[in-house]
């Protein structure tokens, strides 16, 4: 039951962070492009790479810490459902170029940020 609590706690923190970060970033840029979701997903991609390389592979942290940080915190911080809906909305609104930039950018940059996080975690 302790692992479930760790996931729930991390998820609550990650979801609150996602809400706040998305809102701040979206308001800062003030554009219709879904930059808030892109930002939190890229931050999450970076940290999942970092956490796996450093905490899991190097430090071998216990399952509760992994559940709290990776499944909970990063699972709550990142959002596939919002990404999917925003992508669909761009298509529905006829914003084909924005749709392509958003979907390709999220996927390509997400993998790249995961790679960067992993490399940083390995180097520590």
Swiss-Prot record:
Localization annotation = Cell inner membrane
Q: What GO biological process terms are annotated to this protein in UniProt?
A: cellular detoxification of fluoride; fluoride transmembrane transport
Keywords for the protein's UniProt record, in alphabetical order: Cell inner membrane, Cell membrane, Ion channel, Ion transport, Membrane, Metal-binding, Sodium, Transmembrane, Transmembrane helix, Transport
Record comment: activity regulation: Na(+) is not transported, but it plays an essential structural role and its presence is essential for fluoride channel function.
Question: What GO cellular-component annotations does this UniProt entry give?
Answer: plasma membrane
Q: What is its main location?
A: membrane
Q: Which residues bind Na(+)?
A: 75, 78
InterPro entries given for it? FluC (IPR003691)
Q: Which domain of life is it from?
A: Bacteria
Membrane topology per record: Multi-pass membrane protein
* Reactions performed catalytically: fluoride(in) = fluoride(out)
Is ATP-binding there in the keyword field?
no
Q: Does the keyword Cell inner membrane apply?
A: yes
Recorded GO molecular functions are: fluoride channel activity; fluoride transmembrane transporter activity; metal ion binding
* Transmembrane intervals: 1-21, 35-55, 68-88, 99-119
Chain's role: Fluoride-specific ion channel. Important for reducing fluoride concentration in the cell, thus reducing its toxicity.
Entry's PANTHER family?
FLUORIDE EXPORT PROTEIN 1-RELATED, FLUORIDE-SPECIFIC ION CHANNEL FLUC
Say which family it is in: Belongs to the fluoride channel Fluc/FEX (TC 1.A.43) family.
Protein name (Swiss-Prot/TrEMBL): Fluoride-specific ion channel FluC
Report the source organism. Aquifex aeolicus (strain VF5)
């Amino acid at each position: 039951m302790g692992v479930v609590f760790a996931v729930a706690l991390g998820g609550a923190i990650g979801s609150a962070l996602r809400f706040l970060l998305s809102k701040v970033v979206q308001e800062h840029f003030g554009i219709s492009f879904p930059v808030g979701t892109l930002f939190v997903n890229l931050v999450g991609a970076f940290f999942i790479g970092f956490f796996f390389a450093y905490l899991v592979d190097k430090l071998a942290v216990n399952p509760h810490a992994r559940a709290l940080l990776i499944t909970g915190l990063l699972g709550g911080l990142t959002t596939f459902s919002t990404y999917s809906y925003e992508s669909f909305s761009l298509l529905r609104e006829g914003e084909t170029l924005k749709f392509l930039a958003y979907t390709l950018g999220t996927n390509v940059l997400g993998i790249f940020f995961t790679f960067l996080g992993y490399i940083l975690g390995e180097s520590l």
